[in-house]
């Protein structure tokens, strides 16, 4: 799955007078490592590095990074509050109708996190199970589409708030509140110290 940085089609930055740089405001949740996270006051991650590199030598633009909840990033771009969204966004046709995407910067498969001793190899295996996702994400769209088209018991989808990070969802699995959660496969290496998760 290609992971990209996106911007609103035709969205304009804050206007400045002649000779002054225009500000490009970049929205991120700062909680999607390794793509976007904060170290002290510094914005770090692949997406952040990409944006910084693009505007590094610009005489016309300066970049301002803003941390905001995930579910407010694209609405902020739509309203003109932000010009770029940099948050491990994946490409889909619906988004492509509204936003301009960068070239892909990474590729990874989805991975399922579940309690130790369980194994799922397809979406069909998730029939009747319970998971938790952020609304508007590709994970949510994938599950919603499966529920709409599958001839099996639907997957129960709980929609988490933007403040519910992956570590919290993993805790919910450990507590038995959830059956499983989704992430990118390469992110599993960062979870290697978490016990009772497969």
Task: Describe the predicted segments one by one.
Residues 17-88, 162:
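Extracytoplasmic small-molecule ligand-binding "clamshell" domains
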Residues 38, 51-60, 139-163, 192-196:
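Ligand-binding cleft/hinge of the Venus flytrap
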Residues 52, 64-125:
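Acidic, polar ligand-binding/catalytic clefts
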Residues 10-12:
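Bacterial signal peptide processing site
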Residues 72, 87-97, 144-146, 171-198:
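A ligand-binding cleft/hinge motif common to bilobed small-molecule-binding domains
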Residues 4-8:
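C-terminal motif of bacterial Sec signal peptides marking the signal peptidase cleavage site
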Residues 29-30, 106-114, 185-189, 193-198:
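Periplasmic-binding protein-like
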Residues 25-30, 37, 44, 124-141:
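Short loop->beta-strand "edge-of-pocket" segments that line small-molecule binding or catalytic clefts
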């Amino acid at each position: 799955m290609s992971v990209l940085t996106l911007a609103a089609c035709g969205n304009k930055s804050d206007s400045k007078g002649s000779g002054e740089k225009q500000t490009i405001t970049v929205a991120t949740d700062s909680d999607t490592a390794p793509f976007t996270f904060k170290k002290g006051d510094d914005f770090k991650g692949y997406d952040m590095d990409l944006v910084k590199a693009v505007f590094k030598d610009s005489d016309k633009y300066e970049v301002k990074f803003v941390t905001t909840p995930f579910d407010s990033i694209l609405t902020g771009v739509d309203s003109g509050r932000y010009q770029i969204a940099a948050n491990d966004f994946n490409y889909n046709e619906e988004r492509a109708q509204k936003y301009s995407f960068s070239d892909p910067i990474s590729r990874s498969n989805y991975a399922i996190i579940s309690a130790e001793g369980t194994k799922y190899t397809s979406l069909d295996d998730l029939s009747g199970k319970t998971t938790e996702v952020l609304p508007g994400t590709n994970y949510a769209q994938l599950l919603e589409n499966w529920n709409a088209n599958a001839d099996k018991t639907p997957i129960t989808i709980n929609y988490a708030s933007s403040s519910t990070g992956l570590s919290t969802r993993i805790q919910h699995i450990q507590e038995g509140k959830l059956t499983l959660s989704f992430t990118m496969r390469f992110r599993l290496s960062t979870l290697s110290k978490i016990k009772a998760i497969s």
